Amino acid sequence: MERTAKRSVNAVLAGEIETKVTALASDLIGCASVTPLDAGCQAILREQLTSAGFSIEDMRFEEIDNFWAAHGKGAPLLVFAGHTDVVPPGPLESWSSPPFTPTVKDGLLYGRGAADMKGNLASMAMASMEFVKLHPDHKGTVALLVTGDEEAAAENGTVKVVEKLRERGEKITWCVVGEPSSANVLGDTIKNGRRGSLTGYLNVHGVQGHVAYPERALNPIHNFSSALSELCSIEWDKGNEFFPPTSFQVSNIRSGTGAENVIPGSLEAVFNFRFSTESRPDSLRMAVEELLRKHNVQFDLTWRLSGQPFLTYAGKLLEAARGSVKKIIGIEPQLSTSGGTSDGRFIAQPGTEVIELGPLNATIHKVDESISTQDLASLYFVYLDMMESLLA
């Protein structure tokens, strides 16, 4: 493994890998792949991976492009997961350079998706290609799962690719999701889990009437307010050493006709639980519905479970990731389960270790999104070193 460390340091200093990875990342950024559009982005990756000896399987579901690129055979199966779709750039005039014209300035690569996550995807792809070149007869399988549906509904992307893999008996052993996990410096944080997400869509029924005759109406705002106050005050759980306590947040409330003298006939609210492994979605649903009935709220309520919580608290993948970050970057990464959901929720299952390891997240989804070109190279060597630890 010392040979890898020497090779990485020499390459970073010479700028060879930095130049190559930046070039691939720039090609990807140049594709305006705002969900659900691909704009030719995945074809760039497929072509390079095919040339490196990977077998490519296109997995298009409805209007979403996805692909599975694999090299090797059997277990263990190490997967690098990423997405080519990006969020809209927002006002173009606010950008210092066009969002889909990759621009390098002062060591930073600018463009929509630079950090989330085309830059990192380039690092993963090039590291994987280098690994199979150096170790053509490696153990097991190394694969890339690339989706075009992460930033939007996430209904026709990773979740369906994983379903297809499971149907044919391909079980993922380890998965590195390339989301931008770093907070202050590259490699300072590894996400070893994520909270679950459960959203409720509530419709409170009232009776519309004149504000001067409240006895002839039923105000859904008043009806719901006491229940809401209690919902906001509940301690749902205490969390644990890996997760903070489960949180309840209301994101939208809408009621009223716009007139100042009309009691509304209905109220709509949207709320969300970000829940730890100490709570279950069924128990949260039941608790909310029982509380609403206790407060005599007349309601309809539908639920959407976006993902269960997952946690990789130990294992070979986490050991390899921490060791490679320490070796290549020279820091000890911290473990965290903070933040929103990721596609890791679709991949996590019993027996599968899942982590997120990627670049700084300071500029993601922002105007002038950027990534350090040196960090692109460092990530390349971290991923390469991890592959050599696990599969060489």
Language-model features: locations:
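Active-site metal-coordination/substrate-binding segment of hydrolases
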Residues: 77-146, 168, 375-378
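Metal-dependent amide/peptide-bond hydrolase catalytic core
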Residues: 1-9, 16, 57, 180-185, ...
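N-terminal helical capping/dimerization or prosegment-like subdomains
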Residues: 2-92, 266-270, 283-290, 373-375
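Structural motif
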Residues: 76-79, 108, 143, 173-175, ...
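Acyl-CoA/ACP chain-elongation machinery
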Residues: 102, 149, 209
